[in-house]
């Protein structure tokens, strides 16, 4: 079992404290172990998502012929990944999330001039365009608390970074928040209260570059939760299944991989060393289990944390 190290206290916005207690008795504690699940047959994975029960992982990567591909793999160690969808319209899949019923995968794809939000059946089959308009180069994607809308980070047509809401059926994207302090937002999680937790590589916070922001459902502000986060590419963030704790793949000051967790109520930050990982990137918790799917982009490996 890897050691968790208390590293800091951060200032959680007062309006958010107490709003994220455990849901339905689900686990809210940060992960304490990281275990290798799968490698081989794919390269450069970007993001992963767990099935609601945590037994199956889905991830975006490139296959051995360098085609962008969506894969499925058991969350058990030593598993072999199976391709679900490959090639067009997938170009540069960066963000991945699953519908609440586990039937559909939604993809934020930054490829081409404008990028696109795509959808694909989790059981396998071709990806298709969702038909979302008004968002350019989506990077992070998350399911909304009502399961009827998606949230995505991306750009306005003039290049302004923004957070968007998009119906799961497609259509016009609604701007939730735009502009500073957002700079290059990617990783995204939206909790049961509609608060968006956004990872931003280049944004500046009190402790340095690399910021976790909290944006309330009304889009009134983007508050710094933690900064000086040496996140992977793309940055990932997910709350525990029961809420209460935000978990992010990062690196320490020496460049060593770790999972950084922030207790939303207290601001306590802990780090879980992940010495086998090289470039921790995307991460997502199971909806109904204390399991996280984690990708190592550089090493081409999928891990589970719990």
What spans do the regions from the language model cover?
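Bacterial N-terminal signal peptides that target proteins for export
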Residues: 1-9
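Bacterial Sec-dependent N-terminal signal peptides
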Residues: 11-36
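A short beta-strand motif characteristic of beta-propeller blades
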Residues: 32-40, 79-87, 126-132, 172-179, ...
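Beta-rich, blade/repeat-based domains predominating
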Residues: 41-54, 88-101, 133-147, 160, ...
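Residue position within the beta-strands of beta-propeller blades
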Residues: 58-60, 106-108, 151-153, 196-200, ...
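Short loop/turn segments immediately following the C-termini of beta-strands
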Residues: 62-63, 109-112, 155-157, 201-203, ...
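A short loop-to-beta-strand structural motif that recurs across blades of beta-propeller domains
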Residues: 68-72, 106, 115-119, 161-165, ...
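Short loop/turn segments that connect beta-strands within beta-propeller blades
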Residues: 74-79, 120-125, 167-171, 215-220, ...
């Amino acid at each position: 079992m890897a050691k968790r190290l208390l590293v800091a206290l951060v200032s959680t916005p007062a309006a958010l404290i107490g709003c994220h207690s455990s849901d339905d008795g689900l686990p809210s504690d940060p992960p304490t172990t990281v275990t290798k699940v799968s490698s081989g047959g794919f390269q450069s994975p970007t993001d992963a998502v767990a099935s609601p029960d945590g037994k199956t992982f889905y991830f975006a990567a490139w296959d051995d012929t360098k085609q962008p591909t969506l894969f499925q793999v058991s969350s058990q160690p030593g598993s072999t990944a199976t391709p679900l969808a490959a090639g067009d319209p997938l170009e540069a899949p960066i963000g991945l999330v699953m519908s609440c019923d586990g039937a559909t995968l939604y993809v934020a794809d930054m490829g081409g001039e404008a990028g696109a939000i795509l959808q694909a059946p989790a059981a396998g089959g071709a990806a298709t365009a969702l038909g979302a308009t008004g968002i350019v180069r989506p990077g992070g994607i998350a399911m909304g608390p009502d399961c009827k809308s998606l949230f995505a980070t991306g750009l306005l047509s003039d290049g302004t970074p923004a957070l968007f809401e998009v119906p799961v059926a497609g259509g016009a994207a609604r701007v939730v928040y735009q502009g500073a302090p957002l700079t290059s937002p990617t990783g995204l999680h939206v909790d049961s209260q509609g608060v968006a937790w956004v990872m931003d590589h280049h944004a500046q916070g009190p402790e340095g570059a690399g910021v976790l922001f909290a944006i309330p459902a009304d889009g009134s502000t983007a508050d710094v939760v933690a900064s000086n986060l040496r996140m992977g590419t793309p940055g990932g963030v997910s709350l525990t299944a029961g809420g209460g704790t935000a978990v992010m793949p990062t690196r320490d000051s020496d460049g060593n991989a770790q999972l950084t967790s922030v207790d939303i109520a207290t601001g306590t930050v802990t780090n879980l060393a992940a010495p086998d990982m090289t470039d921790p990137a995307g991460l997502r918790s199971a909806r109904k289990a204390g399991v996280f799917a984690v990708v190592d982009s550089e090493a081409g490996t999928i891990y589970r944390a719990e």
